[in-house]
Amino acid sequence: MNTHDLIEFINPLNTSRFKPEGEVGPLVQDSRQVTEGSVFIAIRGTEVDGHMFLEDAIHRGAKVIICEESYYTDAEVCVIEVENTRLLIGPLAQKMAGNPGDKLKIIGVTGTNGKTTTATLVYQALTKLGDKVSLLGTVEKKILTESLDSKLTTADPIELAADMKKMVEAGSEYLVMEVSSHALHQARVGGFDFKVAAFTNLSQDHLDYHETIEEYAAAKKILFDGLKPESSAVINMDDSYGVFMADGISSQISELSFGKNAQVLSNSAQGLKISVDGSAISSSLVGHFNAFNLAEAFMICNELGHDKQRIASALSSVPGAPGRMESVSLDSETDLPKVIVDYAHTPDALENVLKTLSESRTQNQFIYCVFGAGGDRDSGKRPKMAKAALEFADEIIVTSDNPRTENPDLIIADILQGFENTDNVVTITSRKEAIFKAIELASSNDIILIAGKGHEDYQEIDGKRYPFDDRLVAKEALELKAKGGF
């Protein structure tokens, strides 16, 4: 894009006299990534203000600076002043990437719990149905079947546009993406339209960022308020915030409600059987909450025009998301406890998973729960997670999660405040030792839930990420137990 076209697209408040000749780009928001000819856009972040790095960007070779304030420089740089760079970055990133979002049918899934599983189920089902689909989410980033690293639930607008461009070039027709409340509040999903948007549920999470549950809900609603009349919203009306999400939106609304258009036919440790709009789905996924995930995935695929029976058949044969109620076992050993790894890191999610395991357990089968809470996040949920564990687990080991910059022992102390009694509660700060202890203590008949990190392959301590995977650690402990090592 040349400077003239850039200015015309932006429609700025002011521009400097200097206008560089020829093409400019790429677009960057981190001055450390600036190369010769870059367009640097200064974003006011929650911790860092990009306007502090205008001089650094120029020094590194930026030819265009986009900012929210008057800025003078002697350098041969075009300075473009706008009212709000955050609202501009999404549309501009799309424009400079060739508007890849316009060439994809985009499905957005938002909610506190179930985003990853629902989005993954839609991706897997559409792929099974023969569509060319890509996926962006917490666990996986997939361009068709190629897996890439996924760092955030929803990437920044520049990375998002670049990913979409790669997807289009690879032949993708659909993009299924998780949409976080942070991304919506920070306008990270601007510059393209959603074909279908889905709401799973809403409960306490991220209140360190949004401050109140009302602000958190309002951030989620941005996704639905932005839908066009030709788009569709799939909304879980069994959640107390379903009506709020649907209120006043322009799109068509497809409502999910168990007892109305969906039913749970059976729910056991072997899996689920549900009916949605008259179509039966038999899945290896377990738990009442997965009934909602399967039903929403079904309704999303139906909104995209697929045959109901074919959707049901596809969903009956897909595995779901890694680290979501994922079973860990040894191929050759059956005389070992059943180990489940799950990402549950909110009070609601932990309660749902434990309740599911409790409902499916047999007589004299104990449930061990290993969990912690993340540092530098909403501390109010820590004691609530303890209450959830106490209600459904027989033996509890409280440990570290991702303490980040916090002291893990202080996080554990916050959690302990939620226990009415600690008779069956042990604290072990080392997560590896906690997992080993649970597997050492459990009998072959018991169930062990390792909650909080799911698919993650790291543990963040003092701001650094160290290799750590609950599934690999559990497998190591199971191998030791199988050899009689405890």
Segment roles from a protein language model:
Residues M1-P91, S232, S282, V286-H288, ...:
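N-terminal leader/targeting and accessory segments in enzymes
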Residues I10-L13, I89-M237, Y241-Q252, C301-N302, ...:
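Phosphate-binding loop of NTP-binding sites
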Residues L13, E68-E76, A170, H185, ...:
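Acidic, Mg2+-coordinating active-site environments of NTP-dependent enzymes
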